[in-house]
C-alpha cells in the first residue's frame, strides 16, 4: 500500500457519470476532471516551525471534494490514485 508522508493524503478517485441526464454518452475529452474521491491513506500530519505536529483532519474512508488540478496521479497495483496535500482538500462529504 502507498504510505503518504507529512500532510499528504492518498485518495481513490470517484468517477463521474459518463452520461448526461438526457442520456447522451460523454467522451473522455468532454468530461470534467474529477474532484471527488475516497481517502485510502493519510500521512502523520504537517510539522509547524516550532516542531509541533498537526494531526490531519481527514481519516481513511472519508469521501472528499478536492481542488480541480491538485495532486499527483499515480498508478499502483493496477489502480489509479491521487496523492495531494491536505490543504488541497476543500470539504468532507457526509
Curated annotation (Swiss-Prot):
Gene3D superfamilies recorded: GroES chaperonin
Subunit structure comment from the entry: Heptamer of 7 subunits arranged in a ring. Interacts with the chaperonin GroEL.
Organism: Parageobacillus thermoglucosidasius (Geobacillus thermoglucosidasius)
CC per GO annotation: cytoplasm
A GO molecular-function annotation: metal ion binding
GO BP, one annotated term: chaperone cofactor-dependent protein refolding
Protein family membership: Belongs to the GroES chaperonin family.
Pfam families per the UniProt record, alphabetical: Cpn10
Lineage, opening ranks: Bacteria, Bacillati, Bacillota, Bacilli, Bacillales
Cell compartments where the protein resides: Cytoplasm
Keywords carried by this UniProt record: Chaperone, Cytoplasm
Annotated protein name in UniProt: Co-chaperonin GroES
NCBIfam families for the chain: PRK00364.1-2, PRK00364.1-6, PRK00364.2-2, PRK00364.2-3, PRK00364.2-4, PRK00364.2-5
Function text: Together with the chaperonin GroEL, plays an essential role in assisting protein folding. The GroEL-GroES system forms a nano-cage that allows encapsulation of the non-native substrate proteins and provides a physical environment optimized to promote and accelerate protein folding. GroES binds to the apical surface of the GroEL ring, thereby capping the opening of the GroEL channel.
Amino acid at each position: 500500500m502507498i504510505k503518504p508522508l507529512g500532510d499528504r493524503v492518498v485518495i481513490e478517485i470517484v468517477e463521474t457519470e459518463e452520461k448526461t441526464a438526457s442520456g447522451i454518452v460523454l467522451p473522455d475529452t468532454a468530461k470534467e476532471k474529477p474532484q471527488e474521491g475516497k481517502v485510502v491513506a493519510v500521512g502523520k500530519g504537517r510539522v509547524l516551525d516550532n516542531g509541533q505536529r498537526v494531526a490531519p483532519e481527514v481519516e481513511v474512508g472519508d469521501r472528499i471534494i478536492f481542488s480541480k488540478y491538485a495532486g499527483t496521479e499515480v498508478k499502483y497495483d493496477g489502480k489509479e490514485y491521487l496523492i495531494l496535500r491536505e490543504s488541497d482538500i476543500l470539504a468532507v462529504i457526509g
